[in-house]
Amino acid sequence: MKRGLILLDLDFVAGWSRELKAMNEGKEGGRYRYPESFIKLLAVVHAYVLPYRQLEGFMRGLSQYVDGLKAPDYTTIWWRVARMKVDVASSVEMDKDVTIAVDSSGIKVTNRGEWIHKKWRVQRGFIKVHIAVDTKTKQILAIEVTREDVGDGRMLRRLVNGSQSKAALGRVIADGAYDSKSNFRMLADMGIDPLIRVRKNASLKGGGCMPRKFAVVEQRGNLEWRRERGYGYRWMVESAFSCLKRVFGEYICAVKWPNIVKELLLKASIYNLFMKMNLN
């Protein structure tokens, strides 16, 4: 059992002065007092639902045992984390002919409990998270954060484009929410195999989109098409959402939209690191 095991790499302490010198070289205005690697560590700890003020206290306690470690205050932590650039797929290795599975899931914007919703009839809605997952490595190649009223099909192009920057795609697996002529046509134009489940009452008429017509002909009356084409690998994206929610919870702490997006990107980035560790 390794869940909850804390592995803390303190290499950034040894290179504290060297990293700060490089960061402040040519900088105008106030100087940085904390290296970026240290801020990334704080961001990771914060992603595990440890608020910034408690994080300040945690680092003050840790600094008593680690020589050279300086504990920043609450304001500094918040300011630096809010401006930190997060590359979700930084730990992803480039590959060819990659198959991705895409889907979306809702994340609560508060953790005050369902009882409050029922008693006071208060509805704050959800944040919708769209992701594209490599079915081989289970790593997230692309992520988009939207309001709850944004349809899944509209986000496919952005997920595919985001994934293409990290890997050469060969196939996209998606459920019926992504069934549209525009999506089939887009994937075909990119040279990507569209493995999208079409609606049961879909017409056999192509309507100007032959890739979708071929999918309708293939799926209609063929109960084995899922197994033959590997549609079952779509569960990889559902597995990714399940892991994210079990590790980080089903809600977010941030309130402002830019910070909400940053928090979710950070959690996805940490998830990818976990998946890379499992692969190794």
Label for each model-derived stretch:
Residues 14, 145, 208-211:
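Soluble, non-transmembrane catalytic domains of enzymes that act on hydrophobic metabolites at membranes
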Residues 24-50, 57, 70-193, 199-200, ...:
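Polybasic low-complexity intrinsically disordered regions
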Residues 44-47, 222-280:
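Basic, amphipathic alpha-helical segments enriched in Lys/Arg and hydrophobic/aromatic residues
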Residues 176-246:
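Helix-centered, glycine/charged polyanion-binding patches within enzymatic domains
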Residues 51-58, 211-217:
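Short, compositionally biased low-complexity segments
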Residues 1-29:
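Basic, low-complexity segments
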Residues 66-68, 273:
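Short arginine-rich
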